Amino acid sequence: MTEFSPREIVSELDRYIVGHTEAKKAVAVALRNRWRRRRVPADLRDEVTPKNILLIGPTGVGKTEIARRLAKLAQAPFLKVEATKFTEVGYVGRDVDQIVRDLVESALSMVRDKRRGGVKAKAEAAAEERILDALTGPGSTAARESFRKKLRAGELDDKEVELQLADTGGGGMFEIPGQPGASVLNLSEMMKSFGGGRTKTHKTTVVGAWAPLIAEESDKLLDQEALTQEALELAENHGIVFLDEIDKVASSSQRGGADVSREGVQRDLLPLIEGTTVSTKYGPVKTDHILFIASGAFHVAKPSDLLPELQGRLPIRVELKGLTRDDLRRILTEPEANLIRQHQALLLTEGVTLVFTEEAIDAVADAAVAVNASVENIGARRLQTILEKVVEEISFTAADRSGETVTVDADYVQARIGALAANADLSRFIL
């Protein structure tokens, strides 16, 4: 779990996301409160529940990006799901309990990776012995030591070996009919529990054998029960769920029809967000202290179209404003992995140096604003479309222009997209 202060979290998010200070502050405080809760007296700890957040803002302003960056910062089990993927219990589709099951899988993966790091040296030694067994046969001989030296020097990397590895795939998945709350079951996992796990012969090179062997040997050294318990505790107390597209399951007051699935999904989300116990194959998980961050554009529906009970369970509301022309310009240049830098890095692999003048950046931002205003406002995503159109010809001929420096100026941008941006009908289909 991260121990960044709210100010540090915001400054970290500033490296990748332009603007939206209020939203950044809200998620930073919510994240810091997880850390604070662990330090309050035990009798009060269970009473401190997370304050769930609702991010409201038009498409392409950075709601999902905030969640993605927060996940990397949090060092906690994180799951991003689209609310539209779920249906109410009894209908075909995934039910919302699957969110918690997926969160537990994420926590297990985190804990397993951390614990594997602790036994890596022993696992590597055991993997080396198994590779030597495959190369020379078991037993300690002079030939084995000779092979060991060659193996460590990398001389045997391309040599093919035959290994017995645990059979992890190919079991097939199926869903129990008539059991709406049941998860999808993996047949190979069921067989493993009956027969103690099957092995399968794999033919691979020495260099390709290292990763699966180290993973298998690490798992033998780990206490699986303790690992599972730690993962469940981590998911319960530090888990974060980002519910995207929540507005798509809100029933607009003007909309007719049955809307069986929309309202049903909201009703199913209520106990999950409020706090319930979900059974998983690793054991029961309480959702009382899982932080939920919901987001939606709310173009058609309004936040008030959500069920009142669900609105009450998302007490912190943050509105993200639409992006201005200055914001779009900053997005092109300020974030660490900005779009222009990405294009420059891609073309540099071909030996082409791409340079954008300040006027060219202004022209791209102006074109994005114009097309967003005349066609459909998709926010910063419009920049990707326009930049792709601008560098399309350069990318196509880059392989033949190694060693060249290509300067993109305002005239070049106008020549590539000027007519398209001006013509609303063409923009609708091309930009």
Swiss-Prot record:
Keywords recorded for this protein, A-Z: ATP-binding, Chaperone, Cytoplasm, Nucleotide-binding, Stress response
SMART domains given in the database record: AAA (SM00382), ClpB_D2-small (SM01086)
Binding of ATP, residues: V18, G60, V61, G62, K63, T64, E65, D244, E309, R381
GO molecular function, one term: ATP binding
Coiled coil: none
The UniProt record lists the keyword Cell membrane: no
Domain of life: Bacteria
InterPro entries: AAA+_ATPase, ATP-dep_Clp_protease_ClpX, ATPase_AAA_core, Clp_ATPase_C, HslU, P-loop_NTPase
UniProt entry tagged with the keyword Transcription regulation: no
Pfam families: AAA, AAA_2, ClpB_D2-small
Cellular compartments annotated: Cytoplasm
Gene Ontology process terms (BP): protein unfolding; proteolysis involved in protein catabolic process
Major subcellular site: cytoplasm
GO cellular component: HslUV protease complex
NCBIfam families reported for this sequence: hslU, PRK05201.1
Family the UniProt entry places it in: Belongs to the ClpX chaperone family. HslU subfamily.
Function statement: ATPase subunit of a proteasome-like degradation complex; this subunit has chaperone activity. The binding of ATP and its subsequent hydrolysis by HslU are essential for unfolding of protein substrates subsequently hydrolyzed by HslV. HslU recognizes the N-terminal part of its protein substrates and unfolds these before they are guided to HslV for hydrolysis.
UniProt subunit comment: A double ring-shaped homohexamer of HslV is capped on each side by a ring-shaped HslU homohexamer. The assembly of the HslU/HslV complex is dependent on binding of ATP.
Protein name: ATP-dependent protease ATPase subunit HslU
Organism: Caulobacter sp. (strain K31)
